[in-house]
């Protein structure tokens, strides 16, 4: 159990650092649209779909490696709490249309790339 926590923690650190570094990219949101967060969440959803499909196809994958990748790296990398804060900010600033677009794109693209990641393995 303790070793599993170490794997999750190391993966979370790696994912969080990657997330932080991507957030430093000098890209300015167009009309306040949080494109970097959207891209990070879509990439994380794709990675989770791909890893899950690989785990299903290759049963010999190390369970601790899966904890490291799924819960740790992907959990630290994706940003649903940031997504929620940014969506609330868009709503509070009267940008309801952008908030709805951001929410729809996040959900639709997220589910789509999970399926794509799974399909690539099959």
For each predicted feature, which ranges?
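Membrane-interface helix-loop junctions in multi-pass transporters/channels
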Residues: 1-122
